[in-house]
Amino acid sequence: MKKARILIVDDSSVMRKIVERSLRQAGLEIVQVLEASNGAEALVVAQNNALDLILSDINMPVMDGLEFVRRLRNVENAKNVPVIMITTEAGESAVVQALSNGARGYIRKPFTPEQIKERIAPLLEG
């Protein structure tokens, strides 16, 4: 598994830290964790950094995760970066929309480090 540069997008700074801690507890090799509090900030980070993976919430102010994923697919250096949605969304419609916008999968909150590893490790192999 390669050492990864990961962007975590969530409007809660506490949740961003929980996700980062879970990534490390899962034993994933991480070079750098970048953070953004909404989709608009995340687009700027994605445009200016070589990323290996993005983990994004769906419900955020300014630009939600669904719009972020849709717009990310038009960013030349980031259009192929895998995105996993991390969400409390109980309904399937938001998840289906995220997948149709280009997300590679989703993880429901609350989650365990094992769930994080199961979903993310295959995307970081190579």
Task: Report each predicted region and the residues it spans.
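Two-component/phosphorelay signaling modules centered on CheY-like receiver
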Residues: S13-L34
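Conserved Asp/Asn-Gly motif in the active-site loop of CheY-like receiver
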Residues: V33-A40, V95, P113
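Acidic, metal-coordinating helix/loop segments flanking the phosphotransfer/catalytic sites
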Residues: E35-L53
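Active-site residues of response regulator receiver
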Residues: D57, T87
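Receiver (REC) domain active-site loop signature in two-component systems and cognate sites
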Residues: M60
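C-terminal output helix
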Residues: F111-I120
